[in-house]
């Protein structure tokens, strides 16, 4: 069985492909809840982040020094956006969870996540329209 690629790797790989069909096929071939949620964070106006905008002032880890992956923190995402769970923790705790996540994952993943939450993630050829075609019904607004 092939090793599961990180979302960052899938996005970078997809952006290097030449045709729209190849990009759609690659996104679909690497479909995961995390990939789709990162795409929704970035492109769906219905997904509203309740964290401060921008990259917090934290020391990011090189990939070899990272102690965790973005996947390991996936359950915390529900607290970072306007959801039914967001009100269950205090803003201070929410921000601390986010900072801890950023300090444990590789720098590339941390930067990707911060750009996606701010709706500023950009990869050549990966557009809202392309993602809507790859995953119909995923992006609501």
Give the positions of each predicted feature.
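N-terminal nucleic-acid-engaging modules of covalent nucleotidyltransferase systems
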Residues: 1-141
């Amino acid at each position: 069985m092939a090793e599961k690629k990180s979302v960052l790797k899938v996005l970078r790989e997809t952006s290097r492909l030449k045709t729209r069909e190849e990009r759609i096929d690659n996104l679909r071939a690497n479909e995961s809840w995390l990939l789709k949620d990162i795409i929704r964070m970035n492109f769906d106006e219905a997904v509203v982040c309740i964290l401060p905008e921008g990259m917090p002032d934290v020391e990011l880890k090189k990939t070899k020094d990272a102690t965790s992956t973005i996947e390991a923190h996936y359950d915390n995402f529900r607290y970072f956006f306007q959801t039914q769970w967001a009100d269950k923790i205090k803003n201070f705790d929410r921000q601390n969870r986010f900072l801890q996540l950023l300090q444990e994952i590789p720098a590339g993943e941390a930067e990707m996540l911060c750009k996606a939450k701010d709706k500023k993630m950009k990869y050549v050829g990966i557009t809202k329209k392309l993602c809507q075609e790859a995953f119909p019904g995923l992006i609501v607004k």
